[in-house]
Curated annotation (Swiss-Prot):
It catalyses: 2 (2R)-3-phosphoglycerate + 2 H(+) = D-ribulose 1,5-bisphosphate + CO2 + H2O; D-ribulose 1,5-bisphosphate + O2 = 2-phosphoglycolate + (2R)-3-phosphoglycerate + 2 H(+). Substrate binds at N112, T162, K166, R284, H316, S368. The gene is rbcL. The basic functional RuBisCO is composed of a large chain homodimer in a 'head-to-tail' conformation. In form I RuBisCO this homodimer is arranged in a barrel-like tetramer with the small subunits forming a tetrameric 'cap' on each end of the 'barrel'. Coiled coil: none annotated. It comes from Iris germanica. This is Ribulose bisphosphate carboxylase large chain. It comes from the Eukaryota. The active site is at K164, H283.
């Protein structure tokens, strides 16, 4: 028999000599225990509560193999410069998770444990997704290479623009702004994340006018153009209806808000997009609710990894230079996690584990939010070729109008890429490069 009552988690779930398996999902949590709670107990509590544990011993424990299924806290280190804060490393056996379900992965790992009384705060800093698990996901519908081939655009970042004012335009005027931007030289325009189907502009009207704008600009420029048609909706069925209508119009790309829409809806949409040749642009509305606090919540690099598994071809990833916060090294860390195949552990960039994606397609990071032409050299240098640079106000705020704003962005981008290819230092000579480029303008 066994003794009933509350028992210490660390007896079962703190296993400092555990050797992690290649199939384990590893998590790094930033734990802030309540005063008087030892670090080992707090770390073990996280492992228990996010896997097999409950607060007492139960009869049915005897009917399962805890050793096979329990999460284990296998290492704890104090955070330098913080009082009473620790990084707890937890290993989860692969069998705890449903295959191909980001939803289930998050329900298990971060579902319950964040409200835990013994912890003052808890933050999931990073996850190591083993190939045995990542291989059960489709991942991005197309990925970076397939997208470049579809668009026939190589050797430079892609340019986008969010149509502003984000709410209040009629469908026809909205389409007009789309046309002007694409005609001026942008590759993409974008529905704002809040634009779904409101009284002033229903989704079907918007889709039709945007498609018309797209084809007109395409015919006049001889380039392939796209507009991210936001398919986010109140129900999964309605979302699919919008995506299907977009495909019937023959447009190249649709868009989804993956956090507000939810991972289940997002994964369904990603599967549809791969089956039907649509690219999928992902907006991260609501991410700051989850990732902004330094000691509670989830770091965006975890949300980014989850999106690569669930599926998306573009995702917003901060700018390093614009109006929204994001530290340079950390941002570059998760940008690499999105694009690359194999990413080495590097604590200076916030990467706690080596991540091997084993040929899962990559996601293009999107820089968006308060950036404009003068940021172009910095952006080209920071993000490199495989990115989408999005200027909303930075295009539509041009004193001469939308099309000249688009021209300005395209000229600046081409100038920066050319200068970089000639070996010039964008960080030092950036402003000079932009000035040279605009010296041909009448103003």
């Amino acid at each position: 028999g066994f003794k009933a009552g509350v028992k210490d988690y660390r007896l079962t779930y703190y296993t400092p000599d555990y050797e992690t398996k290649d199939t384990d999902i590893l998590a790094a949590f930033r734990v802030t225990p309540q005063p008087g709670v030892p670090a080992e107990e707090a770390g073990a509590a996280v492992a228990a509560e996010s896997s097999t544990g409950t607060w007492t011993t139960v009869w049915t424990d005897g009917l399962t193999s805890l050793d096979r299924y329990k999460g284990r806290c296998y290492h704890i280190e104090a955070v330098v410069g913080e009082e009473n804060q620790y990084i707890a490393y937890v290993a989860y056996p692969l069998d705890l998770f449903e295959e191909g379900s980001v939803t289930n992965m998050f329900t298990s790992i971060v579902g319950n444990v964040f409200g835990f009384k013994a912890l003052r705060a808890l933050r999931l800093e990073d996850l190591r997704i083993p190939p045995a698990y990542s291989k059960t996901f489709q991942g991005p519908p197309h990925g970076i290479q397939a997208e470049r081939d579809k668009l026939n655009k190589y050797g430079r970042p892609l340019l986008g623009c969010t149509i502003k004012p984000k709410l209040g335009l009629s469908a026809k005027n909205y389409g007009r702004a789309v046309y002007e931007c694409l005609r001026g030289g942008l590759d993409f325009t974008k529905d704002d994340e809040n634009v779904n189907s409101q009284p002033f502009m229903r989704w079907r009207d918007r889709f039709l006018f945007c498609a018309e704008a797209l084809y007109k600009a395409q015919a006049e420029t001889g380039e392939i153009k796209g507009h991210y048609l936001n398919a986010t909706a109140a129900t999964c069925e309605e979302m699919m209806k919008r995506a299907i209508f977009a495909r019937e119009l023959g447009v190249p790309i649709v868009m989804h808000d993956y956090l507000t829409g939810g991972f289940t809806a997002n994964t369904s949409l990603a599967h549809y997009c791969r089956d039907n040749g649509l690219l999928l642009h992902i907006h991260r509305a609501m991410h700051a609710v989850i990732d902004r606090q330094k000691n509670h919540g989830m770091h965006f690099r975890v949300l980014a990894k989850a999106l690569r598994m669930s599926g998306g071809d573009h995702i917003h990833a901060g700018t390093v230079v614009g109006k929204l916060e994001g530290e340079r090294e950390m941002t570059l860390g998760f940008v690499d996690l999105l694009r690359d195949d194999y990413i080495e552990k590097d604590r200076s960039r916030g990467i706690f584990f080596t991540q091997d994606w084993v040929s899962m397609p990559g996601v293009l990071p999107v820089a968006s939010g308060g950036i404009h032409v003068w940021h172009m050299p910095a952006l080209t240098e920071i993000f490199g070729d495989d990115s989408v640079l999005q200027f909303g106000g930075g295009t539509l705020g041009h004193p001469w109008g939308n099309a000249p704003g688009a021209v300005a962005n395209r000229v600046a981008l081409e100038a920066c890429v050319q200068a970089r290819n000639e070996g010039r230092d964008l960080a030092r000579e950036g402003n000079e490069i932009i000035r040279e480029a605009c010296s041909w303008s009448p103003e």
